[in-house]
Swiss-Prot record:
Name of the protein described by the UniProt record: Uncharacterized lipoprotein YfgH
Lipid positions (N-palmitoyl cysteine): C22
PROSITE patterns recorded: PROKAR_LIPOPROTEIN (PS51257)
Annotated source species: Escherichia coli (strain K12)
Transmembrane segments: none
Keywords of the record: Cell membrane, Lipoprotein, Membrane, Palmitate, Signal
Entry-linked InterPro entries: Bact_OM_lipoprot/Surf_antigen, Gly_zipper_2TM_dom
Amino acid sequence: MMKFKKCLLPVAMLASFTLAGCQSNADDHAADVYQTDQLNTKQETKTVNIISILPAKVAVDNSQNKRNAQAFGALIGAVAGGVIGHNVGSGSNSGTTAGAVGGGAVGAAAGSMVNDKTLVEGVSLTYKEGTKVYTSTQVGKECQFTTGLAVVITTTYNETRIQPNTKCPEKS
């Protein structure tokens, strides 16, 4: 029984840390992040006047992280289950196999608890363009924006990429 406890604790800790890390940070959705096919291309640019900055939450796709967590959970669960089954089953192949199968199933089930969507920090920017007022919600931090002039870059129809017009304080 002591071997069982010694094996289970590190495996459980590793699995929980790994599954907790399966959350998208959505940095690739920020206004100042571009794909390689958008580089060195002409993009329409305008200046606008930001008049309001409000916090927002943006739901982003997290399904790839969920699939990764399920696969990793199944792998870790199978290994841990095999070791536990081997120890509990007095070294028998059937105990090892049963433990690996059961552990793999439990690990995959644990990985499926990762959400398909995750909420990330965003901003809702209200801005004036000419005489009209618009709102654009995008991934970013409030500290990246300030009221006043900002640049909007359009890479596709009806897209607004309001560029950060200030920097967040550096963490020390």
